[in-house]
Each structure stands twice: as C-alpha cells, then as structure tokens.
A protein has these predicted regions:
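Class I SAM-dependent transferase core
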Residues: 1-34
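Conserved beta-strand segments of alpha/beta enzyme cores
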Residues: 10, 61, 87-89, 171-174
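Conserved Class I SAM-dependent methyltransferase catalytic core
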Residues: 12, 16, 20, 133-186
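Conserved SAM/SAH cofactor-binding pocket of Class I
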Residues: 26-108, 114-120
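Residue-level signal for inorganic ion chemistry
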Residues: 27, 109, 138, 193
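Mobile active-site "lid"/loop adjacent to the S-adenosyl-L-methionine
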Residues: 110-137
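SAM/dcSAM-binding transferase cores
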Residues: 184-230
C-alpha cells in the first residue's frame, strides 16, 4: 500500500494496525486549535491527527502517544518527513503512565469496541478495543494532563459518547453529531470539553454524504485543506 497523501503531508501506514480513516480526519479538521501552544494526541497511531494539528495550528509542541511500539515508530517517521518535524514527536507510553507538562489541547480518536469479539490480531485489538484504555481511565488521564482553561476533543459512537459525557469531570462546550446521510441515524459524535464551564454548548451536525451518495458540501468544506480530492 502506498502512502496516504494529503495536500501538505503524507502518511505511511503499511505496518500500522489502524489505517487513516474518516473518524480521525474529521476530528482533526473539526477541533478548535485557537490559542493552543501544547497539544497531545492520545492513541496517535500513524500520527495523522497530530500532523493535522501541526498544519492547522501555531502550537510549539505536539506530542503523540501510543502503546503500540510499531505505531509510535511509524508516527515518528511520518513526523520526520513532514514540514513540521521540529514541532512533533511520538512517545511509546500508556497515557495512564504518561508524565509531562500540562497541555492546552488534548485530542483523541479512542478505542471503543467494548462488547464485540476481540480481533485475532493483537495490535488491532490494542487499537480498536478498550481492553487497555477504558473511557474512565481516559478521562482520569485527560483531567491530569489538561491545563487550566484547556480543551479535550474526541470522537466516539453515540452510545459511548453519551456514556463518556455522563461520567466525565469535564463539561461539553462544543458538540457535532455526524451522519452518513441527511435524516439518518447519528453514526459518530465529536465533542469538545473543558473544566467547570457554565456556557451553553455549541451544537452542530454534519452529513458526510448527500442523498445522491456524493460528498456533501459541508464535509468538503471542513476537510478541503487536507484531502487531495477536494
């Protein structure tokens, strides 16, 4: 498989369990990066979200962490081939054990297949299932690593997101419901959370496709700085 090419960078992914997908790209394009100087990407995989953060922001330091050593090595390689190599690095470490200065922005496309049969490929299991990182552990780690006034953005299926929001010590400030087609069921939810805010959350929605099975104008608009086809 050749590299997945974006407008300003490419992602090599042959040896990585979880390839570049719609969830990660959509989150990376949607999250608010304004004012973020230090960014953490939990479960960085290929490093695609961290690379998108580097393209979109003026952050001085962007760190991707992953428990898969092969993914971490690949992310560092992808970072080194990018225009922003001095601002990016990947660490092979469970977030529960990760120690660092606080981050202004934390992003994650976390594992969520909690009830399905485990993949026979152990590395895909790590990437796709919550066997090594539960949502409560994720929340504890984010709260520990998030700076005052910082934000946490993630994408999950609806049921898991509602469960996460209900148990989180953080509060939603932005939310976007993601549909495959207009009028269909919600397939994913993106949320941005912060500490102790009393503000009313900004609510959005996006359909990836039109009824004619073409990419929607709103999806094209949000991802146009990245996908070659837009």
């Amino acid at each position: 498989m050749s590299a997945f090419r974006f407008k300003q960078f490419a992602v090599e992914q042959d040896d990585v369990a979880m390839k570049v997908g719609t969830d990660g790209v959509l989150l990376g394009a949607w999250v608010d990066v304004a004012g973020a100087r230090r960014i953490l990407d939990i479960g960085t995989g290929t490093g695609v979200i961290a690379l998108m953060m580097a393209q979109r922001s003026a952050a001085e330091s962007i760190v991707g962490i992953d428990i898969d050593s092969v993914a971490t090595a690949r992310a560092n390689s992808n970072f080194g081939l990018s225009p922003w190599q001095t601002r990016l690095r990947a660490c092979n470490c469970p977030v529960q054990q990760f120690e660092a200065e606080k981050f202004d922005l934390i992003v994650s496309n976390p594992p969520y297949f909690t009830d399905s049969l485990l993949c026979p490929d152990s590395r895909r299991t790590l990437a796709r299932h919550t066997t090594e990182l539960s949502l409560s552990e994720l929340d504890d780690s984010v709260c520990r690593l998030l700076a005052d006034g910082g934000r946490f953005a993630l994408i999950l299926p609806t049921e898991q997101m509602e469960r996460y929001i209900a148990q989180s010590a953080l509060r939603v400030v932005r939310r976007c419901d993601v549909y495959s087609y207009p009028g269909g069921e919600i397939k994913r939810v993106m949320a941005e959370l912060s500490r102790g805010t009393e503000a009313v959350a900004q609510m959005q929605s996006i359909a990836i496709y039109t009824e004619n099975r073409e990419y929607s104008a709103e999806y094209r608009q949000i991802t146009k700085d990245f996908y070659l086809k837009f």
